[in-house]
Amino acid sequence: MSEDSEVVLVGGGIMSLTLAAMLRELKPSLHISVYEMFEDLATESSSVWNNAGTGHQALCELNYTPQKEDGSIDVSKALKINQQFELSKEFWAYCIRKQILKGAHTFLNPVPHLSFVVDDIVPYLKKRYETLKDSPLFKNMIYTEDREQIKEWAPLLLEGRGETQKMAVTYMAGGSDVDFGEIARQFGEKLSQKEGFDVYTHHKVRDLTKEGNIWLLDVIDTKSYERKQVKAKFVFLGAGGGSFPLLQKSGIPEGRGYGGFPVGGLWLICNNREIIEKHNAKIYGKASIGDPPMSVPHLDTRIIRGKKELLFGPYAGFNTKFLKKGSFFDFPSSIRLNNFIPMIQAGIDNVPLTIYLIKQILSTDRMRMRKLEVFFPAAQFPDWNAQFAGQRVQVIKKDKNGRGSLQFGTEVITSSDGSLAALLGASPGASTVVDIMLEVLKRCFGDEMKTSAWQDKLAEMVPSYNRSLEENITHFNECRLKTAQTLHLPFDEI
């Protein structure tokens, strides 16, 4: 059986469905097909239980503001990520006004973001605050070492803590908790109501090859075992960990030399309703010296299907699957002659990561509780249950010196003719989804992106695209106020 489509999106998560929504707004006549191998959209990395749900805006995440050798704080990444997440919020607000998405409360809730440190890390947090507060993006940040104020914001931090321990927090009221899976499902539901948009669940893309200007995809219906050949002019691989094997099968030169390293996650989930109700914040700490960025601990209020929850983690683990429901053969089968040496080099250069993962795998319940007790000293083991989170594939690619290097961000790979794009990597991931998709559009729909029709539409969809909010305070206030009002988030004008 053969099916034709102008655009094929592989994977039914937040990435693919956001690209679909943007393309249908820019070119409503475009025929788009989404192929998802599982029973529903957004069941892997986008699922509410498989990620932290943090709207990453660098309001509290200390790994985005490293301390340099001279003691100063590098805030360049924080400024960038803050504006990237704003693009996502602007597009969601636009979609609510256009009734593409339902009310903001169905997928996004205001939750304050706090950074928290103790003892000898306190000077770092104060210096971070002093560096960030002059930017309009962080002007409303509050720093305090006052225990009474901290107790008001986050009472669990003080329960059972010694009175002499030095501690400090920064507080940002404008943080958020996001259900990325719900956004993907709402996009899928709304877009499917119109002709020219098809979602195929239980459909696995097994292979893809290029013939002339057309991609031929080998697809199997995993329920009926019917095989199909699907033709497409443009293919986006947005299947989380499943994107990497398909990128390899595509054969595009731009994908050669890349490797993927799978890392699993685990949460401690609070089962005590009294404790859950006491806490209302996402609180991020600082990774221990030598630990990778993925190890940053955080104590998170989540709003999951309308119910308040409390999670702590993440604790990392290792298995060879690229997806939570994937195969143990995923990692070994991804090793090729063109990526073997870069992967070995990355392994040699990341011995601390290997040691960290071994420690995490061997961790006992008691050891996990000790990590939680840094945030909540009065925590008791019976109040918490361990639950596996999602699976991520960290990117390995050659650095500027040609040596394999482990990456902790998100990577967009496109073919030279712009007919295929693949998304690899992890954090900040879904929070910056709109910025990532704008990059895909720029690389793969370059001619259309230059037209006045697309430029005008993009200005309506994401008003701050290609504009620095820091350099135009009036525009900053107008854009952020309008977005905050639609999303029911707090906002104070600068």
From Swiss-Prot:
The keyword Chloroplast does not apply. Keywords: FAD, Flavoprotein, Oxidoreductase, Tricarboxylic acid cycle. This is Probable malate:quinone oxidoreductase. Pathway: Carbohydrate metabolism; tricarboxylic acid cycle; oxaloacetate from (S)-malate (quinone route): step 1/1. It holds the Pfam family Mqo. One of its GO terms (molecular function) is 2-hydroxyglutarate dehydrogenase activity. The gene is mqo. The keyword Flavoprotein applies. Belongs to the MQO family. PANTHER family: L-2-HYDROXYGLUTARATE DEHYDROGENASE, MITOCHONDRIAL. It catalyses: (S)-malate + a quinone = a quinol + oxaloacetate. Its EC number is 1.1.5.4. HAMAP family: MQO. It comes from Helicobacter hepaticus (strain ATCC 51449 / 3B1). Its cofactor is FAD. SUPFAM superfamilies: FAD/NAD(P)-binding domain. GO terms for biological process: tricarboxylic acid cycle. The lineage of its organism: Bacteria, Pseudomonadati, Campylobacterota, Epsilonproteobacteria, Campylobacterales. It comes from the Bacteria.
